[in-house]
Structures are given as C-alpha cells and as structure tokens.
A protein has these predicted regions:
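Active-site histidine-acidic residue metal-binding/catalytic motifs
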Residues: 2, 8-96
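Solvent-exposed loop/turn segments at secondary-structure junctions
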Residues: 41-43, 84-88, 113-118, 132-134, ...
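A short, glycine/acidic-enriched catalytic loop
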Residues: 43-55, 114-146
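Extracytoplasmic/secreted envelope proteins and their assembly/folding machinery
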Residues: 61-64, 68, 93, 97, ...
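Long, well-ordered alpha-helical scaffolding segments within enzyme catalytic domains
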Residues: 62-72, 134-151, 193-199
C-alpha cells in the first residue's frame, strides 16, 4: 500500500470516528425560559443590609432587571419573580414553586448576597439542592463564570444544601434545576466597593 493510500485510509477512519462520536452525542437543549427570583421577596422581608445601606431586595431587584434585559438581547425569555405574596416563608416558597412550574421555566435562580457579623468574611458561593446533579452542574457553571470575571475574590465553592439548611425550601420547591447565587458579602467593605451599583 502506498503512503498516500495509507494516509487516505487514516483520514477515512478519523472521519468515521468523528461521525460516530457526533451521533452518540446527546442533543443539547436550548435554554428557552429562565426564572429570575429576587431573594427576600415575601411580605415584610428585605434581607440583609449592606455596608452601603442597601438591602438585599433593592440591590437584587436591580440585578434581576439588568439580567432580564441582557437575556432578552441573547434571545432568551425570562420572568422576574420579585413579589412572593405571603408573610410565611414556606407558603411563599410553595407559591413560587407553583408559579415557576406553570411558566415551564428551564432553570431557576434566586439572587442574594451574603452577610456576616465580621466585616472580614468575604467570597462567593453558589448553592444547589443536594442530590440534584443538574442543579450542581448549573451552580458549577455560574461559579466558573464568576471566578473568571472576579479573580480577586475568594472562591467559597459550590455547596449542596440539604434538609434543614437555609435555602433548601427554594431549591426543593421549584421544579427545574435551581441555584442560589451568593456572589459577595454585603457586610464586607472591600467587596461592596466591587459590587455596589453605580448610576
């Protein structure tokens, strides 16, 4: 067999391998609808207050509106949930789960920021429901994107939330894969400088 024929055979095998690999690949489902949930949206709850005097709800309502606008430009539909009509946390989460289910959202994210008694606490973390592989994958994607953008911050990781832990009701109540975003500590002056909204 001539060298040129051997090369042709190798190229044929490579093409066949690529075709077989492509056929095995699962079709990637396009993201159609995102539920953007503003944390602390139940009656009488505004969340923690940052060192800049802005509470979680006010801060994240603005983030939600910006995110919705950005997604619209990407051709992705989203719905902002910023008013959970109940004082009770469990009833608010039940309502939210049903509302997101009716909208048939592909993913759900709830926007927060962390806070602690010490101003030295800092970093970002993304939470998912324990046992949810899709939720873990979603949280990992967000964490990776965050770490590439804000290299100066401490990476607190992707965290699984289980029964009895804060945030579990949201993560368990909503039908699609879900995560809670905690991108910084509002109680940290150093991080507030990075994340405060500027008009």
């Amino acid at each position: 067999m001539k060298p040129s024929e051997i090369l042709d055979k190798i190229l044929e095998l490579i093409a066949a391998y690529r075709a077989a690999k492509a056929a095995k690949r699962k079709k990637v489902r396009k993201l159609k609808k995102v539920a953007i949930c503003v944390g602390h949206s139940r009656i009488g709850d505004k969340g923690a207050c940052s060192v800049g005097g802005v509470n979680e709800w006010c801060y994240n309502k603005e983030v939600a509106d910006l995110l919705q606008n950005h997604l619209r430009h990407q051709g992705i539909h989203s719905i902002v949930f910023d008013d959970y009509p109940s004082e009770s946390y469990s009833r608010a989460m039940d309502w939210l789960g049903q509302s997101i289910g009716k909208e048939k959202c592909d993913i759900a994210i709830e926007l927060h920021f962390n806070s602690y008694s010490s101003t030295k606490a800092e970093g970002y973390e993304y939470l998912h429901y324990e046992g949810s592989q899709k939720g873990k994958r979603l949280a990992t994607c967000f964490l990776n994107a965050h770490s590439e953008t804000f290299k100066v911050q401490k990476d607190r990781g992707v965290k699984a939330v289980g029964s009895g832990q804060r945030g579990v009701s949201f993560l368990r109540s909503v039908p699609p894969p879900a995560l809670i975003c905690e991108p910084f500590f509002g109680s940290s002056p150093k991080e507030w400088i990075l994340f405060e909204h500027r008009s």
